[in-house]
UniProtKB/Swiss-Prot annotation:
<dbReference type="GO" id="GO:0051321">
    <property type="term" value="P:meiotic cell cycle"/>
</dbReference>
<protein>
    <recommendedName>
        <fullName>Chromosome segregation in meiosis protein 3</fullName>
    </recommendedName>
</protein>
<dbReference type="GO" id="GO:0003677">
    <property type="term" value="F:DNA binding"/>
</dbReference>
<feature type="region of interest" description="Disordered">
    <location>
        <begin position="1"/>
        <end position="42"/>
    </location>
</feature>
<feature type="compositionally biased region" description="Acidic residues">
    <location>
        <begin position="263"/>
        <end position="276"/>
    </location>
</feature>
<keyword id="KW-0234">DNA repair</keyword>
<feature type="compositionally biased region" description="Basic and acidic residues">
    <location>
        <begin position="237"/>
        <end position="249"/>
    </location>
</feature>
<dbReference type="InterPro" id="IPR040038">
    <property type="entry name" value="TIPIN/Csm3/Swi3"/>
</dbReference>
<dbReference type="GO" id="GO:0043111">
    <property type="term" value="P:replication fork arrest"/>
</dbReference>
<feature type="compositionally biased region" description="Acidic residues">
    <location>
        <begin position="1"/>
        <end position="12"/>
    </location>
</feature>
<keyword id="KW-0469">Meiosis</keyword>
<dbReference type="GO" id="GO:0000076">
    <property type="term" value="P:DNA replication checkpoint signaling"/>
</dbReference>
<feature type="compositionally biased region" description="Basic and acidic residues">
    <location>
        <begin position="17"/>
        <end position="27"/>
    </location>
</feature>
<feature type="region of interest" description="Disordered">
    <location>
        <begin position="236"/>
        <end position="316"/>
    </location>
</feature>
<keyword id="KW-0131">Cell cycle</keyword>
<comment type="similarity">
    <text>Belongs to the CSM3 family.</text>
</comment>
<dbReference type="GO" id="GO:0031298">
    <property type="term" value="C:replication fork protection complex"/>
</dbReference>
Amino acid sequence: MSYVMDETEEGINIDNTQHDLELDRDSSTQQPAQTHEDDGDLLGLDKPIKLKTRAKIAKVDNQRIFNHNGIPLLVKTHSKLLRTLKKNDKNFYSEPRSSISKSQKFEHEYENLSSVLQFYQLWCHGLFPKATFKDCIHLIRALGARSPQLRLYRRELIAAELHKLKVAKGIIADENQDAPSIPEEENTTDPSNEEWNSMHMSALVPGSSNKNGLFVDSNSNEDFETTNEVNAAASLADKDALSTDDKAEQTNAITSDTHNNDVDSDDPFSDDDDINIDAHTENLHPASGTQHQDRPKETTEENEDLELELMREYGA
């Protein structure tokens, strides 16, 4: 009772506290009933599954930058920007004034820059509506650094504009054949590159139908057959010349040996035999560095037959 009296003195309502206690009891009795109901579907297999579609992440790529809202739109509409700049310059310099101050020049440049920025802001908004102007510029710069297609497109545009300026100033003559054309949206491949790639692949792929697969022009074999025949004839002529030289040296050595043997056959203690042996070795191995070895006829004929078979396999 003393506790209740203290609460009443402090201004606490006893009726509200009793009501709160009753609510707590009711909630405690209702919680076990709910748990018994949920015991049958603990894993949630009977609950309906809500499918959510993932939103596509917008990004700046070659497909977006080369569509009708990308760089082709800039190429078509940049003439309007040039006209506005010329109009601003004409209005600025047409006003009658004695002198132009620096502040007036800065204001005029500010107007031109604001028109340029507005032009590119509208273009970026049409290209990438969800991105800010700063983010769009950053994404386009990153794409230009890693996309070779975009770099090639930009170089061709610059070359076309330089050609127009040179023609306008009279530096070069206006020839439609020499004028660089503005690149199209679709990628056009060079036929020479396709031929080179096909020839390169035919050379690298083993087991191809072409016999001369290691050569560049693997389909035409007539030129290689003629060259192989010429090379074979030249090699045979060289071998015949070498064989005749070897035979002449052998005959010279044999005649010198027989002559020395006939002269000094009676002297068993003569030293001419060693001299003849040295002369024979010198004839076989001259000092010029070219070694002519005594090759038997059988080995040379076998080597020639093998070389002819190899030339027929690779050259036929």
